[in-house]
Structures are given as structure tokens and as C-alpha cells.
Amino acid sequence: MRDGRRRVTVVVAAAIQRDGRFLVARRTRPADVAGRWEFPGGKVEPGETEERALVREIREELGVEITIGERIPGEWPLTGALVLHLYVATLVDGEPTPLEQHDEIRWVRIAEFDSVDWLPSDIDAVRSLREATA
């Protein structure tokens, strides 16, 4: 018997810190979000922890290693049955290069967040990060 709830897939993203700045990445696809900015990450696969998924996704998308810090309080709906969880992370090895789904990366200070053309679905997560790091 079904209870009427649909299955939710978690998407994890990393607010990677370095020298007082956070790494943001510009999407290349799908077309409706191309050119918009986000914190990089991806979907948690079945049987995978959020932390392992985030380390894997950042390695695949940017070619670097990170350590995962605190999760920013909140859960933000994306499209369909996807929800976003945002973690603070620290770069520990490598120089980030956009390898998949992104064509540019930038390091921005929190004070510059308002000048970033964020994905609409990320705006509330960005606001929560700003509040958590104030």
C-alpha cells in the first residue's frame, strides 16, 4: 500500500571556501539554466551518504578534493522531487577547473553574492549561507 508520499532525491552542493571567498560555477546545461551560477554538486545516489556524494561530485565536476564541513540549516526545493542541501567545504587538493556542466568558475566574497546571477532555485540557500556565516 502506498502512503501518498513521493520519493525525494537529495541534491548536495558545496560552498567551497578559500581565502574568504566561495567558489561559484556557471552552468552550461540544461538550456533553461545555462549561464546561471550555482554552488557545484549533484545528486546523492542510492546507498551513498550526502558527504560521499558531495566529495564524488566535486571531484567529477572540478577535479579537486574537498573536506566537508557543516551543513547549512535548511532544505530547498528544486524541480520535481529534488531538494537541495548545502554544505560548507574546504579545498584541500588541486586547482578547480570546470570539467562537467560548467564553463566558468569564480571566487566571490559574501558581500558580492548579490551581483551573482544565481539559479532561481539556489537563492534561498545562498541567503541561508549568508546568515549562517555572518
Task: Please state what every model-predicted region is.
Residues 21-60, 64:
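Conserved Nudix-box catalytic region and its N-terminal flanking loop in Nudix hydrolases
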